[in-house]
Amino acid sequence: MKHILRIFSGYWLMFIILVGFTYAMVMANLWLPDKMSEIVNNGIIKQDMPAIWHNGLAMILVTAAGGLCSIVIGFLAARIATGMAQKLRTELFERVESFALADFNKFSTASLITRSTNDIQQIQMTSILLLRLALMAPIMAIGGLQKAIHNAPNLSWIIALAVSVLLVVIAMLFVIAVPRFKKLQTLVDKLNLVTRENLVGLKVIRAFHNEKIEQKKFQQANTELNKMNLFVNRLMMLLDPIMTLVMNFSSVAIVWFGAHLISSGNLQIGNMMAFLEYAMQVIISFLLLSMVFIMVPRAAVSVKRVGEVLDTLPSIVDPQSPQQLPHDATGKIEFKDVTFTYPDADLPVLSSINFTAEPGQTTAFIGSTGSGKSTLINLIPRFYDVSAGQILLDGVDIRQLKLEDLYDQIGYVPQKGVLFSGTIASNINYGNAKASQKLVEKSAKIAQAAEFVSELKNGYKNEIAQGGSNVSGGQRQRLSIARAIAVEPNVYIFDDSFSALDFKTDAKLRSALAKETKHKTVLIVGQRINTIMNADKIIVLDEGKIVGQGTHQELMKDCEVYQEIAASQLSEDDLQKMSATTAKGAA
């Protein structure tokens, strides 16, 4: 709630104006029945036409003024609510963007989408309702009750009875419906999760012909949400017939008992008509308040869910007193006794990691699945922070650098090439907005993307569809590599980034990349020995520990784990050739 109040404080002037127009509108509505009473008592019954014309004209003018006030109130309420929603949505997006990878684990992707769309929409709708009704209803109820008692005090018990019945019904609905609102938002999360999984895994679903199973899962989630929606909506719909019954019975009772009072000379016809109008205003006011009280708990669930995200502080932030990299920074990376454990995990993924990656050299990492290769290089751009030890960049602990300064030094290419909606050029210069067209083209050429780009109708201005769906996996990966090159960093990180390339393209790319990065620090994660065997240093990981460091020839001689990997990937002829080469090198 504190976030809502903080954002709302920026609209206090609009709110004050809205309060003024709301008060004016309610006063206009409360003034009309009295004038109607005067027309009946002093005009119609006494056949005083000037009184009829005078009061009738006044009623028309006041009605027009009230209508104008209502329009202004609607405009201001919408402006405040939509402005708050926009601000809230922006803050939520910025907070999520600042999260470290560990922070994302606290919320599912589907839940974050629901919170930034459905929940904020719920807050916006309730805000409009509150601004329009929460102010108007109490004033109308109190003013209407005073006016009603003034016109016919003997009939005021009818209003008390009608309001009591309404309050009992509303309380019952409140108790039943409110617990369902939280469940409703959870079911929306569940449906979004199933939908997202189906969209992301569509190829796998079709490949294994599991469409019916996924349809069943979706239908189950959809049915649960539908049942809950129906239950809540039916409860809300009960208010309408109950309201109609209460108003109709109240009207009948007022006319019935009012007629007896009129016949006995204790009440005038105009006063009874005014009382009837005021009674309806009071009853409607309580109905409006009940709608507010029912909607607020539902919105409160959304406020809490949005607040949970905004209250989650990023676990990785800039240091209070950041250090500067040396002016002649070269990109030297040092791991000193680094240990890392994932949040909520019992055992470390990496233990006592020590190595140095020198500028002008290529350092490669290899190991079995789950050995910690990708985790290790994800520590360098601070996707996660080390649990113990230090990672130094040119002698400075990366935790003491501003994140922006750290990212400027790194060109990162993930396992799966990621492209964004826009042009090919905008994707290549994504990490370097100041990149010239010449640099964009040079980066594409090094990444072996220039050839296929030149064949496109619009070249570098060709549009990339969402997720890069209109380019192949290899093209997507080459553009991702070009994006890293365009940053012109001191440190290049390739997380198994050549897997989608054919042998010929891979060889050309590595040759061009070697020339471009001859004075840079290059870190490569590989699954296949033939992709990393020419590296200056190969680090072998097994169960989160370094079990070997050296060149390919050295590891083939001394590292048992590396030998096992080689034996599983290479033919006997290749192994014999490598053994001969190793023996020759040793001699």
Can you say where each PLM-predicted feature lies in the sequence?
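An intracellular "coupling" helix at the cytosolic face of ABC transporter transmembrane type-1 domains
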Residues: 98-102, 118-131, 135, 139, ...
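Membrane-integrated ABC transporters
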Residues: 1-32, 36, 44-60, 65, ...
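Helix-loop-helix
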Residues: 48, 143, 147-164, 175, ...
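Short intracellular "coupling" helices and adjacent cytoplasmic loop segments at the cytosolic face
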Residues: 46-47, 82, 90-114, 118-120, ...
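Internal alpha-helical transmembrane segments of multi-pass membrane proteins, especially GPCRs
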Residues: 16, 20, 53-57, 61, ...
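Transmembrane helices of ABC transporter permease
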Residues: 10, 14-27, 38, 62, ...
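ABC-type nucleotide-binding domain
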Residues: 326-587
